[in-house]
Amino acid sequence: MIQRPATLPTLSILAFTLILAGCGAGTDLAQRPPPGYVGDVAARVSAVDWAQARPVTVQLDEFRFQPDRLAFERGTPYRLTLENRGNVAHTFTSEGFFKAIAVRRVTTAQGAVETPALVNLEIPAGQTDVVEFIPVEAGTYDLACHEPLHSSFGMTGAITVR
């Protein structure tokens, strides 16, 4: 049996596959708000009755958020449940929205993190994450999944804070 060296197209496909495999965004939480984020988070979240938090659920699956349009009211506490019903990991990413909210807690399969600043939230296939937050700044913000090609295939949405 004669072995042939790998061809350029084969190597290119292999390299592209490895690049995509390494591009998963992962969950990124900052313990201190980066520049541009809402400040005084601890005081904001401690002043709220979390028993009154409004529940909102978003389902993520292959190339869609359901619902893909979300609306929140400033100063109202929310418990956002993100259910990944897909077969692959998805992210819930909205840089502008993350900068405009005070986060009390993020709960993932690994446990809970108190008062983080969200940078990116990745939900593995079949798992559920919960974000408890208060919207602080009004605006309309883009929402997208930042896994490779997901937003290109329509996994986008919008978040409005009134």
What are these regions (language model features)?
Residues G24-G39, R64, T115-R162:
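Extracellular/periplasmic metallocenter environments
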Residues I19-G22:
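C-terminal motif of bacterial Sec signal peptides marking the signal peptidase cleavage site
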Residues T108-P116:
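Short beta-strand and strand-turn-strand segments in soluble, beta-rich domains
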Residues I2-S12:
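Bacterial N-terminal signal peptides that target proteins for export
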Residues F98-A109:
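Short aromatic-acidic-glycine turn motif
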Residues D68-T93, T128-E137, V161:
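Beta-strand cores of secreted/periplasmic/IMS beta-sandwich domains, seen most often
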Residues L29-V56:
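N-terminal low-complexity, Pro/Thr/Ser-rich intrinsically disordered segments
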